[in-house]
């Protein structure tokens, strides 16, 4: 039996039962699938989290993102979804993503 948790207010999904092989980041005009094998580290706090992979950096801004940081550290996150324009300005939820950006890292 698989346990998949999805909360529309959080804009991210986790899977606690299976080994996750990749993180899917869905933006308004593009989708990235980043393999967990290339995950280096995550850093941040309640209002911003950065997840760094070998060639990309995922920057998430919002509220209550400490829970996302913990989920990333455990590599349980299957999906991070950029909110729609209308959802970006909600203020009643205690956890939500306001903005997601994916940047390609410079090579030396």
What are these regions (language model features)?
Residues 13-16, 41-42, 51:
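Short, exposed beta-strand/loop patches in secreted or surface proteins that constitute
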Residues 40-42, 56-59, 66-67:
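Short, surface-exposed beta-strand-loop junctions and turns on beta-sheet-rich folds
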Residues 45-56:
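Short acidic, Gly/Pro-enriched loop/turn segments at secondary-structure junctions
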Residues 33-45:
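Phosphoinositide-dependent membrane-docking surfaces
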Residues 19-33:
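Short aromatic-glycine motifs in intrinsically disordered, low-complexity regions
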Residues 60-108:
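Helix-rich interaction surfaces within compact, conserved domain-sized segments
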Residues 1-17:
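Anionic N-terminal interaction surfaces
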């Amino acid at each position: 039996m698989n346990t998949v948790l999805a909360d529309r207010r959080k804009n991210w999904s986790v899977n606690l039962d299976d080994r996750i092989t990749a993180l899917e980041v869905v933006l308004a005009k593009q989708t990235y699938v980043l393999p967990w094998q290339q995950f280096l580290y995550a850093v941040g706090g309640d209002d911003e989290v950065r997840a760094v992979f070998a060639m990309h950096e995922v920057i998430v801004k919002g509220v209550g993102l400490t829970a996302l940081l913990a989920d990333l550290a455990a590599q349980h996150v299957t999906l991070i979804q950029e909110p729609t324009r209308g959802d970006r300005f909600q203020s009643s939820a205690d956890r939500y993503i306001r903005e997601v950006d994916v940047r390609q890292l410079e090579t030396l």
